[in-house]
């Protein structure tokens, strides 16, 4: 059975980028069709990414905090974990959000077509669903087809003990010994969860630090905290993976490589993602797609085909939901006739580990590479009353300032709820604030948030909560 429909705008993919674009198009009065290959809206982020991982990380945090309270006179019994109930909780969270999206689509009169969509021409997409196909003829299209985990040819990915991030989030079992390939955000978040649930976690990373995009001083605080939780094998890479009846055997080479192949009960491959650009038959619409699968766009998210736009993971790094949402808004606004552009000064990045590692704007390594003259100011949480009282005093807040203008150009926070504290720094960079603007803003006390203001005071030389290196010297 097949049918044919017409729309002013068709959006291919319903992840955060796609549904945001579709809903904004509808709000701007455009007849909109949203194509999604799965039965629920929300894409990777809501279904098998950002949201379920945060639900599991919440469970992990409660377990670890309960254990830590023993040092403060409150002793709980050994936690009894029921992974079936944890899984049900995670799915409840996901269902609440995906159900909310379906409701908002109906409220906005967005037509949702389920099935695998591919271009058949510059103004048509064929959607193959279960039992029926739909041809969507469109005036404008927005490609938001996302990305998928990278698979390496020497790894037997068909073995159920070799996981990608989706498999890890299913929480089918808690392996006794888990290897995580890749010391990036996804791998470390999953390592945090499985360690709390009882797995012995090992992480192999080819670079000399985990979370390679972040500055070393920030990551150092994180690695110091987890040294007794994870075994880190830095400057080491996997060379072979063999699936045997009694486990997965992994051979490695490098600085921390074991001499012999190590046996693991499960291996999580978390070495990045690849865009889905080559899976949508874009060439039939005249789209230019590079060899990796990325679609090139301009600042209005327009492809080489003027009436086709692309947003989200499929247009390039960083592959982050919040970046895709803003790109989706821009594409919708442009299609409606507005002169909007995607030109952010900053895009925040956060590892929702414990402690969290969050940064925004320029890192030190980026500032150095660009030849920017800069100065760093840090405020250690060891001097924060709230951090000490909350038993998280190993954190740090860092600001990076342009040495000539004193404007803040970057910042990072490592510590409990660091991602929640990052917003002020991002806004300060977008608004062109200098150190004085931040330092003279009264921050509530005692809070972790005030560490941002105190770091600015360190730069300004007005700090009174630490020894002041810029104090006027008495003659």
Swiss-Prot record:
NAD(+) binds at residues 182-186, 205, 238, 270-273. The active site is at residue 445. Its EC number is 1.8.1.4. Its main location: cytoplasm. One of its GO terms (molecular function) is dihydrolipoyl dehydrogenase (NADH) activity. The gene is lpd. Keywords: Cytoplasm, Disulfide bond, FAD, Flavoprotein, NAD, Oxidoreductase, Redox-active center. One of its GO terms (cellular component) is cytoplasm. The lineage of its organism: Bacteria, Pseudomonadati, Pseudomonadota, Gammaproteobacteria, Vibrionales. It comes from Vibrio parahaemolyticus serotype O3:K6 (strain RIMD 2210633). The branched-chain alpha-keto dehydrogenase complex catalyzes the overall conversion of alpha-keto acids to acyl-CoA and CO(2). It contains multiple copies of 3 enzymatic components: branched-chain alpha-keto acid decarboxylase (E1), lipoamide acyltransferase (E2) and lipoamide dehydrogenase (E3). InterPro entries: Class-I_Pyr_Nuc-Dis_Oxidored, FAD/NAD-bd_sf, FAD/NAD-binding_dom, FAD/NAD-linked_Rdtase_dimer_sf, Lipoamide_DH, Pyr_nuc-diS_OxRdtase, Pyr_nucl-diS_OxRdtase_dimer, Pyr_OxRdtase_I_AS. It catalyses: N(6)-[(R)-dihydrolipoyl]-L-lysyl-[protein] + NAD(+) = N(6)-[(R)-lipoyl]-L-lysyl-[protein] + NADH + H(+). It is found in: Cytoplasm. Its cofactor is FAD. Gene3D superfamilies: 3.30.390.30, FAD/NAD(P)-binding domain (3.50.50.60). Belongs to the class-I pyridine nucleotide-disulfide oxidoreductase family. The active site is a redox-active disulfide bond. It comes from the Bacteria. It is an enzyme of class 1 (oxidoreductase). Disulfide bonds join 45-50. Binds 1 FAD per subunit. One of its GO terms (biological process) is 2-oxoglutarate metabolic process. This is Dihydrolipoyl dehydrogenase. FAD binds at residues 36-45, 54, 117, 313, 321.
């Amino acid at each position: 059975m097949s049918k044919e429909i017409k729309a002013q705008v068709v959006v291919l993919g319903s992840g955060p980028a796609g549904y945001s674009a579709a809903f904004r198009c509808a709000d701007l009065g455009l007849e909109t069709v949203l194509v999604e290959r799965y039965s629920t809206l929300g894409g990777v982020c809501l279904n098998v990414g950002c949201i379920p991982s945060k639900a599991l990380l919440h469970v992990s945090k409660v377990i670890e905090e309960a254990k830590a309270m023993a040092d403060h006179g409150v002793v709980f019994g050994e936690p009894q974990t029921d992974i079936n109930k944890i899984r049900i909780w995670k799915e409840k969270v996901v269902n609440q959000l995906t159900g909310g999206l379906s409701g908002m689509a109906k409220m906005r009169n967005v037509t949702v077509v389920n099935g695998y969509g591919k271009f058949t021409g510059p103004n048509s997409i064929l959607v193959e669903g279960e039992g029926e196909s739909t041809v969507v003829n469109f005036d404008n299209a927005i490609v938001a087809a996302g990305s998928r985990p990278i698979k390496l040819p020497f790894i037997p990915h068909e073995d159920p003990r070799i996981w990608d991030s989706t498999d890890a989030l299913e929480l089918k079992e808690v392996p006794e010994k888990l290897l995580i390939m890749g010391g990036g955000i996804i791998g470390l978040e999953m390592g945090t969860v499985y360690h709390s649930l009882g797995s012995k976690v090992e992480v192999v990373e080819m670079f000399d630090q985990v979370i390679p995009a972040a500055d070393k001083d920030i990551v150092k605080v994180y690695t110091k905290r987890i040294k007794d939780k994870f075994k880190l094998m830095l400057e080491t890479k996997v060379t072979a993976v063999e699936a045997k009846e009694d486990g997965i055997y992994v051979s490695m080479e490098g600085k921390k490589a074991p001499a012999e192949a190590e046996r693991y009960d499960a291996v999580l491959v978390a070495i990045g993602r690849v865009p889905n650009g080559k899976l949508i038959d874009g060439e039939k619409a005249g789209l230019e797609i590079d060899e990796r699968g990325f679609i090139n766009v301009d600042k209005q998210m327009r492809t080489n085909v003027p009436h086709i736009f692309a947003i989200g993971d499929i247009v390039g790094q960083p592959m982050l939901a919040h970046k895709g949402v803003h790109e989706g808004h821009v594409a919708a606004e442009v299609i409606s006739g507005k002169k909007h552009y995607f030109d952010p000064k900053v895009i925040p990045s956060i590892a929702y580990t414990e402690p969290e590692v969050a940064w925004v704007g320029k890192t030190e390594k980026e500032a150095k590479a660009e030849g920017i003259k800069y100065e760093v100011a840090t405020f250690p949480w060891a001097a924060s009353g709230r951090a000490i009282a909350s038993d998280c005093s190993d954190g740090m807040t860092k600001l990076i300032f342009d040495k000539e203008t004193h404007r803040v150009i970057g910042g990072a926070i490592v510590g409990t709820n660091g991602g929640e504290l990052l917003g002020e720094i991002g806004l300060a960079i977008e608004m062109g604030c200098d150190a004085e603007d931040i330092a003279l803003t009264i921050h509530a006390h005692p809070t972790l948030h005030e560490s941002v203001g105190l770091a600015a005071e360190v730069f300004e030389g007005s700090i009174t909560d630490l020894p002041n290196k810029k104090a006027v010297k008495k003659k």
